[in-house]
Amino acid sequence: FDPRFEEALLLLADGRAILAVGNEGAVYAEFAARGVEIVLCPSLSLMGQSRKLGHTVPDFLRSAGVVEGDRVGVVGWKSFEPEEWESSTPAIAAPAFLVDALREAVGSSNLVTDATRVLMDSTSGLRAVSGPDQLAAFEWAAARASACVERVTTSIRPGMTEHEAVAAMGYAGEPLSAHIMFASGPEVAIGLRSPTERTIELGDAVTTAVGFWGGLCARAGLLANGPEDLRAESEGYLERMAIPYWRAIATWYETMRIGVRGDEIQAAVEAALAGAFSPALNPGHLIHLDEWLDSPIRPESTETIASGMALQCDIIPDSTGPGWAANCEDTVAIADQALRRDLARIHPELWARISARRRFMEEQLGIVLADEVLPFSSAPARFSPFWLDPERALAYRS
């Protein structure tokens, strides 16, 4: 169950699971939620809707057994580092009206604390590692996302509008983890934006991304057949941007393994870039139903990669020249021998796809993977800098 249009509140205590929902969520929860008590709380509904039936938020908390003196942990959207917060009242990234009602119910602000890391911490969070069935769902999402992106990058032509280019992805209504992204021309640096009616031109920088629950794929490059189509401002793109970028992508994959520290991955990526540019954000992060869960990959991080993690290889350049763009983002999972055995036994078709992808990366791209690295994208690490020549991709020399 995921709330749509409204907030929802799941309360767990004394062996009970109680889900408070608004007017629209009440109908959806009956269909989508399992193993929980569903309670109507119309204050969670949109403005202007009826509040006549159901509970107020304080009434719901009382009926659920929240009383003065209770300690309550709240899982919000994210947690904060100690240096980010100066108040003695715990910082909680959840709707204020819910947090205020909880504090009133237990009689003290300090009895309501942030418990977000119980689920989302990059090493100890319950959602940081997944079992074989959840990983199988993520593999579907990642493979589907990469197929959508490939259809866009291989069918795009000068003269199309951005909307026409993105229509090639074949979106079929699946839940998204991020807005569908596409940008071209001088605004390509704003990779987060949605497609427009802009007409795409030969030599444009182009970028696109598609993400479903559990997997995202992104690619960026130039709308050209090769260097001969480049504008003056794009001179040197291949040597100074595309090749160092892909070298960092390949290094990320070859460094990834169980037990490697986050700062080791960060350092390896920065060394591979050799000063050409730096990662704008963490060069990789955990992914789940949400596109970014947390990241163990950052400077000075002693957190280690563990079996069961689903990760994005996500290196965003911190600077680009005019008309330049490079991106090659895909999803992988990390699995020890026992988890690999379970995946192969329970999901043999998935395992066959993973095995084929590993062979492709090693035999065609020259990237050597640890046994525990399982590519989920249909074209892992395949980076074609010139979109009008999709058959040509960067690889290590054999």
Predicted regions and their residues:
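Active-site neighborhoods and metal-handling regions in enzymes and metal-associated proteins
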Residues: 1-398
